[in-house]
Amino acid sequence: ITHHNSLDMELYLRIAPELYLKRLIIGGFEKVFEINRSFRNEGLSVKHNPEFTMIEFYAAFEDYHYLMNFIEELFKSLFDSLGFKNTVTYQEQAIDITKKFERINFHDSIIKFCDSISSENLNDYSYLESYCKNHDIEVSVKDSLHKTQLDIFEKEVEGKLIQPTFITEYPTAVSPLSR
C-alpha cells in the first residue's frame, strides 16, 4: 500500500517484480521473466506515468551483450508475429526493424549529436555549463559533471534517437542501476 501524492489517493500496486524474480534465479531458475503492472510514486509528467505495464527478465550467467542481443531478437520476433514486414511507422518516422540495432555508448552519443561537443571538451564542466546556457538547458549550480552530461543527453540526444538504439556505459553517478 502506498499513498499517491499527486492524486491524493491510496494505491495497492508493487513497484517492480524484481525481488520475486531474483528469488527464482537464486532458487536455480536460469532465466525468468514477468509481464506486470507496476507503480512508482514519483509524480506525473510527460515522461513518467506512475502506473505502467512492464516486462522484466533476468538471465543468470549472462552479460549485457547477451541481453542486448536477446532484446533485439525479442523485438524482431514480436514485430514479425504482429505482421509487420521491414518497417513500422511511428510518429511519421519509418523504423527499420530488420537492421541490427545500433549500440552506442553514452558519451559517444553526446559527441555524435551535439555539434560543438567533442572528446576534448566532454569532461570540461565549465564548457558544458556554457553549452547548456546557450542551448536553454537548465543546470543547477549543484549539478555534477555527469548530471550535466545527462541533462544534455536528455535534451539534445534522446529526441534524435529514431532507430532502435542501445545506449551503453551509462554513468553510474546518475543511475543507481547502471554498471
Q: What residue ranges belong to the model's regions?
A:
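Hydrophobic (often cysteine-bearing) scaffold residues that line and stabilize catalytic clefts
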Residues: 13, 17, 67-71, 145, ...
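Class II aminoacyl-tRNA synthetase-like tRNA-binding/catalytic domains
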Residues: 1-66, 76, 133
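Internal, well-ordered alpha/beta segment that forms a basic, Gly-enriched binding/recognition surface
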Residues: 17, 30, 63, 74, ...
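Metal-assisted phosphate- and nucleotidyl-transfer catalytic regions
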Residues: 81-179
